[in-house]
Amino acid sequence: MTALRFPLLAAAASLSLAGCWYSSSVSGSRDGTNTMRAIDTANATTSPQQAEAFISGKTWRSTESSSGQHIHYSAPDGRDFAWFRGEERILAGEWRIETATDSRGQAVTRLCLRYPGETVHPISKTAGDQWYCRAAGSVFHGIPERANGDVLGLAGRTQAPFALTLSNLTIAQLKARANPPANR
């Protein structure tokens, strides 16, 4: 009887404690709870109009990728020009905003990117012509900086101005390095 009591007690305890990490009232921001709640809120409340306004006609810098930052210019007509770490050229692709259903059946606004000229999509590692879509709030959480217009001239370039590294440079730092003043 004693041998059965402890495994049953352990099983009951683990079932009752499952999921406490995320919903614990004593959790602080160090464990990621506040960040996850902010992303969940952004995913639930970002409208398609807000998502489009966030990136349309903007140069934006994403730092969420484990492979380092990537820089985009998302033109208002749906074209996307992307500069990825390790790439010697600017990738020409497309962006769109769509509404889909999440795992709980709730409507969620998504940002989708694809690069039809590429064999492999630089983010998802699937076929380049396949749309890679993520909840807009999640994507925007990893974008620390945006600038109006094509401030790095990505739409007019085929070659990257220099190789991006793992270090996160600001848009101003990237611009200064990509377009150095002429020597006099």
Region spans (language model):
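Bacterial N-terminal signal peptides that target proteins for export
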Residues: 1-8
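Lipid interaction determinants
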Residues: 21-92, 98-184
